[in-house]
Design a protein with these regions (language model features):
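Polybasic/polar functional segments that serve as interface/processing modules
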Residues: 1-110
Length: 110
C-alpha cells in the first residue's frame, strides 16, 4: 500500500494513469487480466478524481487519485511476491510525490 501526497498533475490525467498502470504491471512482473477500469468519481467533492481497478492474474491493483489535494492511495494486492522498491520507483517516476508512505505486507496462506 502506498499513500502519496504532493503529486504532479499526472494524477489528473486518464492517459497518465493508464500509462502508469501498464508500466507498474510490467515493472513488477505481473500479468494483467483484461483492461483496467479507470473512472472519474465524485465530481465536486473534496475527494474527486480518478479511480483505477486492474485485475491481475494473482489478484488486483486499485488506486484513487485525489485531484484537489494532490494525493493518491495505491494498493497492489498479489499472492505473487514483487519488489516493493521497484513499485515505489514506478510511482515516483510517474507522479513525483513529495511524500510517500509505504505499508508492505508479506502474504503467506500456508
Amino acid at each position: 500500500m502506498l499513500d502519496i501526497s504532493g503529486c504532479n498533475d499526472a494524477i489528473k490525467s486518464y492517459d497518465s494513469i493508464y500509462n502508469f498502470n501498464r508500466d507498474l504491471i510490467k515493472s513488477i512482473d505481473m500479468t494483467a487480466h483484461g483492461d483496467p477500469v479507470i473512472e472519474y468519481l465524485l465530481p465536486g467533492d473534496p475527494k474527486q478524481g480518478f479511480s483505477l481497478m486492474q485485475l491481475i492474474t494473482t489478484s488486483n491493483i486499485c488506486a484513487h487519485f485525489v485531484e484537489p489535494d494532490g494525493s493518491a492511495y495505491i494498493d497492489i494486492f498479489s499472492c505473487k511476491t514483487f519488489d516493493i522498491l521497484v513499485a515505489q520507483s514506478v510511482v515516483q517516476r510517474h507522479f513525483e510525490p513529495k511524500k510517500m508512505r509505504v505499508n508492505y505486507i508479506t502474504r503467506n496462506a500456508g
